[in-house]
Amino acid sequence: MTSKAIYPGTFDPMTNGHLDLVTRASLMFDHVILAIAASPSKKPLFSLDERVALATQVTSHLDNVEVLGFSELMAHFAAHQNANILVRGLRAVSDFEYELQLANMNRHLMPTLESVFLMPSEEWSFISSSLVKEVARHGGDIAPFLPDVVTQALMAKLAAA
């Protein structure tokens, strides 16, 4: 039996913390879907197509990782992909309560869907996409926190705004 996991998120933009988690998930599971949520309510800076393209570039060295966009409920997406594992990152205790609620709701909607929580490597434990965007907007150096192609795309996007 092969294992298929989904690592969902908005990834606006994808950070080195995200890359750390998807890389580690790719070592744990036979197939990993990096599922990029449309998330229009979050008003993403990058379009869904842009986020999918960037994530595809960033993960191209991971042979068992597939990048897909989605706009449906996660449990429905997981069922359509024949996946029964969700990979989620926990940066801090403050993430746990929200993630617990999500895991319980997903299990209610799809009883065979299990959530697996990974802690980021220490060097990425304080990074979030929103924090990186805020630092970039104020002229801070974001290069250490993002893959190079994402840094270039973010700087170009902010310059065009």
Swiss-Prot record:
Binding site for substrate: T10, K42, M74, R88
GO-annotated molecular function: ATP binding; pantetheine-phosphate adenylyltransferase activity
Cofactor(s) for this UniProt protein: Mg(2+)
EC number: 2.7.7.3
UniProtKB keywords: ATP-binding, Coenzyme A biosynthesis, Cytoplasm, Magnesium, Nucleotide-binding, Nucleotidyltransferase, Transferase
Binding site for ATP: T10, F11, H18, G89, L90, R91, E99, W124, S125, F126, I127, S128, S129, S130
Reactions mediated catalytically: (R)-4'-phosphopantetheine + ATP + H(+) = 3'-dephospho-CoA + diphosphate
Pathway connected to this protein: Cofactor biosynthesis; coenzyme A biosynthesis; CoA from (R)-pantothenate: step 4/5
Chief location: cytoplasm
Enzyme class: transferase
Subcellular location: Cytoplasm
Site feature location: Transition state stabilizer: H18
A cellular component term, taken from the record's GO annotations: cytoplasm
BP-aspect Gene Ontology terms: coenzyme A biosynthetic process
Top-rank taxon, per record: Bacteria
Described purpose of this protein according to its UniProt entry: Reversibly transfers an adenylyl group from ATP to 4'-phosphopantetheine, yielding dephospho-CoA (dPCoA) and pyrophosphate.
Quaternary structure and partners: Homohexamer.
Family: Belongs to the bacterial CoaD family.
Official protein name in the record: Phosphopantetheine adenylyltransferase
Source species: Serratia marcescens
Gene, per the UniProt record: coaD
